Structure formats: C-alpha cells, structure tokens
C-alpha cells in the first residue's frame, strides 16, 4: 500500500482542467461538443438555482430561454407560451408588417392587469361583431359602452354565455338584446389597486371586472383568466403594465422603418435587427435611427461572432448582441459562404468583450440539448435562442403532417429558398434581395412532433438548474463569475470521449427525456 501514500497531508490538490481563457487560447474553433465542464461542490438543491438573467441592458428574464424569429418557430402562440414561462419570443418578419404587428398585439393583450385598451362595442353592434372579435383576439368577454369606445358610459357586457346557443341566423341580432345589462354587473371604482380589484373579482365569481369612474364611464377592465395565469405561471415575463413581454424582428432597409413604427405602436418591448452578418453600414444606420426616434426601445444587434464585429454595434448603441453565424441545424452559411465561427468560440469571445460595456449576449444557434444550453451560459451568454429545439411543438406555426406514420412539422432556415420565396424579408437578411441568382444559406426540412412546450420548457429549466448544481453555481451570475475568475474548469473532449459520453454498447434503447 506504500505506493498509494503521498506526503504532505490531505491539503494537496493538483491543478486540474483548463480555465475558459486557456481553453480558447489557441486558434482552434470549438463548439459545444468539443468540451465538458468539470464538476464542483454541491451545497444547495437544484430548485434553489436562480436562472434570472439579462436579455438587454434594461430587460431581465427569469428564464434564459428565447424563441428564434423564424417563420416556422415564433408567432403569437409561441411568444405567449415563452413569456408565460419566464422567457421571451421574437415574432418573425417573414410576413407583412401588419401581420407581424397584429401578432405582437395578441401577445400584449393576452395577459394583463388593468386592461386600459380592451375591445369595446356599442349596443348597436351585432352578435356577428362579437364573433369576429373572438376570432381576431381570442376572447369574447366584451364591455358594451354607449358609443362603443373607452371613456364612454358603461351599459353592459357580452360574454360567451350570452351568445353560446344562438343560431347562425341570430348573428345580426343587436347586442342591446343579448348583453348582460349594467344593473347586473359587478364593477370597481377608478383608483382601486390591482390587489383590491383582484379580490373583488374573486368574490364576484364573474369573468370580467369593469373599472368605472364617478360618471360610470369605462376606464379599464380586469379578466378572471389573468388571475389564473398569475397563479399558474409565477415566472411570467411582464412589463410595468403587467403585460407579457414580446420581441419582434426587423430588417435593416429603408422600408423596415414602416414595419418598426407598426411594431412599436403594437407594444413591442424589444427589437432584434435580423441579419446573418450584423457588422454592416445598414445595421449601424438602423441602430442610430431607432435610438433617435424611439430612445427607450431596447435594440438587439447581430448576428456577430467576433469582438471586432461586436465593437461597431456596441459603439452604435445596441442594448444586446446576438451571437452565431452558420451554426444552426438548418444553416449552411459556413458551407456556402466560407464565413462563420464554431459557436463555443464565438460565444466566449464576444461575451468576454461585450461584458466590459454591460451588453448581454444571446447564444443563437447550435443548441441541440439542455447540456448545450448550460455550456453556452457557462461561456458567458446571458440567454440562449432556440430554433430547432422549439420547432414542431404545438405552439410553433404550421400544420402537422404525416410521413411514413410519423407526425411532423416543417422547419426551415430563413436563408432557405423556401423562406426567401415567401417574402423579401428573408432575402434582405442575407443581403440578396437584389440578386438575380439567389444563394441559399439554409435548408428546409421537417421535425418530429415534440408536443407542447408547456412540458418541454420546464424540462429545459430543470436541466439547467441541475447542470448548475453539478457545477456548484447557485445562479447564472455566479456561473459567469466562476468562469471569468478561472474557478470554473473545462476539459477538451476527443472523438472517443464524445462517443463514451453518449449512449453506447446497447443493442437497442429508448431515450425519454421527460
């Protein structure tokens, strides 16, 4: 046993692993599969890990997860679901400006405290108008005022219970004949606090609580469904008015300024400038324009993969940076353009530079597993943007179809010819709108049905928390501090090590993640 003895006592611990600086010191481009994080010391439970992180200089999320502005990933349904679970969704711009603004409006109206601009109708409107509003906005509890506008005298309310059993021939019936009249309504006075209004609504057992002033004029409304959402989604991302946070993508051309105006009017909280290569005169000019016209609007620039690219956008005034070029599962930019960078290296290099200016970084692309999310955050990213991970979920745009008995949804890169043919916005993203020959930088494909993100995102959240627990970081800010101080250690993986780290040696197996 003598050969096992080491003199000097138990205080001796040999140096082990590499710091992030050492890991990326040479010119090798590393991606998430090329390294592992060495475990630390656990003295807390996984549920205690705080995942709060910055999206931009002024917007903080309770969950570091973002859905990508792709036309097969994020429209209103996805953005609503992401915001409810503490993240945020960015509505794609491969559509008309009006359609995109309406999607943002759906998100902002989905869950609120005091709804100060609800849909309002007059007694002379018809049942058909209510049904049309339900199709457009997703609800049918509509206050009725004398003139059909806010600030007018409240005369009643129409809910689904008032019109559920009406036949199609009754769609021309006036609302004055079917509405619940004012005398039967429970209301709250203007000036009531949100807490007091919620208590009144709970006691009344009504679906809606109108807020009226001394002249009985409608000034706001509160919905019971919002109370239930507040209970079920404690991490929900909300603005100062208790509305869900929502982002939107725009291009960098002159006609995108009209789109920007509509998005700000719809209530977008943050804009991402959508470009495959963000270090351009077009994007810098757009940042200057937005900051001059809408100084309080948060702007995310990108995409970038080097500190030099990041510098120009930070100097222009961006509030966040989107990192990634050619690393997405449906992206062929590196193959076609010979430009890009392995995502691990890109995230570390840009985040290390941007943190000096207080600019958060979004790791965009190359995320295939929850382990990749943890690695991106450990390299300095504040949040992670996902495309393929969220594609083919219930909330993603598009219809399911079957192929060989498998339920699928379409998923395509915004640089694919399919996406470019749908709208010129995709062409502008890749600077090709004026080209006679379109150069595809993405592909179209399909992904197997994943079900609802109501189950998938909680799995991601729990996975991040357990990853941080193994590392010994009780919050994402601690995780980044450990990385920059050198306390967090990494190790490169050979191809054999990568094979060993996956499932191997089995004849067959079933891989259930949640």
Swiss-Prot record:
| Keyword vocabulary terms for this entry | CBS domain, Cytoplasm, GMP biosynthesis, Metal-binding, Methylation, NAD, Nucleus, Oxidoreductase, Phosphoprotein, Potassium, Purine biosynthesis, Repeat
Q: Which residues carry this modification: Omega-N-methylarginine?
A: 341, 355
Origin: domain of life: Eukaryota
Family annotation (Gene3D superfamilies)? Aldolase class I
**SMART domains for the chain:** CBS, IMPDH
As cofactor, the record names: K(+)
Binding positions for NAD(+) per the UniProt entry = 274-276, 324-326
Q: Where do the annotations place K(+) binding? A: 326, 328, 331, 500-502
Phosphoserine modifications at: 160
Which cysteines pair up through disulfides? They are none
Which GO BP terms sit in this record?
Answer: 'de novo' XMP biosynthetic process; GMP biosynthetic process; GMP salvage; lymphocyte proliferation; purine nucleotide biosynthetic process
Q: What Gene Ontology terms describe what this protein does at the molecular function level?
A: DNA binding; IMP dehydrogenase activity; metal ion binding; nucleic acid binding; nucleotide binding
Q: What is its EC number?
A: 1.1.1.205
For this protein, what reaction is catalysed? IMP + NAD(+) + H2O = XMP + NADH + H(+)
Please tell me which top-level EC class this enzyme sits in.
oxidoreductase
Matches recorded under Pfam families: CBS, IMPDH
User: What is this protein's function per UniProt?
Assistant: Catalyzes the conversion of inosine 5'-phosphate (IMP) to xanthosine 5'-phosphate (XMP), the first committed and rate-limiting step in the de novo synthesis of guanine nucleotides, and therefore plays an important role in the regulation of cell growth. Could also have a single-stranded nucleic acid-binding activity and could play a role in RNA and/or DNA metabolism. It may also have a role in the development of malignancy and the growth progression of some tumors.
Q: How does it assemble?
A: Homotetramer.
> NCBIfam families, alphabetically?
IMP_dehydrog (TIGR01302)
| Similarity comment text for this entry | Belongs to the IMPDH/GMPR family.
- State what protein this is by name: Inosine-5'-monophosphate dehydrogenase 1
């Amino acid at each position: 046993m003598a050969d096992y003895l080491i003199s000097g006592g138990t205080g001796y611990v040999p140096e082990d692993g590499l710091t992030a600086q050492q890991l990326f010191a040479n010119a090798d481009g590393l991606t998430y599969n090329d390294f592992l994080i060495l475990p630390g010391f656990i003295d807390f439970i996984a549920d205690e890990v705080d995942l709060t992180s910055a999206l931009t200089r002024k917007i903080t999320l309770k969950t570091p997860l973002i859905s990508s502005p792709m036309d097969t990933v994020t429209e209103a349904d996805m953005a609503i679901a992401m915001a409810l679970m503490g993240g945020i969704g960015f509505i794609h711009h491969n559509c008309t400006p009006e359609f995109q603004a309406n999607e943002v409006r759906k998100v902002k109206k989905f869950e609120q405290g005091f709804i100060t601009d609800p849909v309002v109708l007059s007694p002379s409107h018809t049942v058909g108008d209510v049904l049309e509003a339900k199709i457009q906005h997703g609800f049918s509890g509509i206050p009725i005022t004398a003139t059909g506008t806010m600030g007018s005298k409240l005369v009643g309310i129409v809910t689904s219970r008032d019109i559920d059993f009406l036949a199609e021939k009754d769609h021309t019936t006036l609302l004055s004949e079917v509405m619940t009249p004012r005398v039967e309504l429970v209301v709250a006075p203007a000036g009531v606090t949100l807490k007091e209004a919620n208590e009144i609504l709970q006691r009344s057992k009504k679906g809606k609580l109108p807020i009226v002033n001394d002249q009985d004029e409608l000034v706001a409304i509160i919905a019971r469904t919002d109370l239930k959402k507040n209970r079920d989604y404690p991490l929900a991302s909300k603005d100062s008015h208790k509305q869900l946070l929502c982002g939107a993508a725009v291009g960098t051309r002159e006609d995108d300024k009209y789109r920007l105006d509509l998005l700000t009017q719809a209530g977008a909280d943050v804009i991402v400038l959508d470009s495959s290569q963000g270090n351009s005169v077009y994007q810098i000019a757009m940042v200057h324009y937005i900051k001059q016209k809408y100084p309080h609007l948060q702007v995310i620039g990108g995409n970038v993969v080097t500190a030099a690219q990041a510098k120009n956008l930070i100097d222009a005034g961006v509030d966040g940076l989107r990192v990634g070029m050619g690393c997405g599962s449906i992206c062929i930019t590196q193959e076609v353009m010979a430009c890009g960078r392995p995502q691990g290296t890109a995230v570390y290099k840009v985040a290390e530079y941007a943190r000096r200016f207080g600019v958060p970084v979004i790791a965009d692309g190359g995320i295939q597993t929850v382990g990749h999310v943890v690695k991106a955050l450990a390299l300095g990213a504040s949040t992670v943007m996902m495309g393929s991970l969220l594609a083919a979920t219930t909330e993603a745009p598009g219809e399911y179809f079957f192929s060989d008995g498998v339920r699928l949804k379409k998923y395509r890169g915004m640089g694919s010819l399919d996406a470019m043919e749908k709208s010129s916005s995709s062409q502008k993203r890749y600077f090709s709108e004026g080209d006679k020959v379109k150069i595809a930088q993405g592909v179209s494909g399909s992904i197997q049905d994943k079900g609802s993100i109501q189950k998938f995102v909680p799995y991601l959240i729990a996975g991040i928390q357990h990853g941080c627990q193994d590392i010994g970081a009780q919050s994402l800010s601690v995780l980044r501090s450990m990385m920059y101080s050198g306390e967090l250690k990494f190790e490169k993986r050979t191809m054999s090590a990568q094979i060993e780290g996956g499932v191997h040696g089995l004849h067959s197996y079933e891989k259930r993640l949640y």
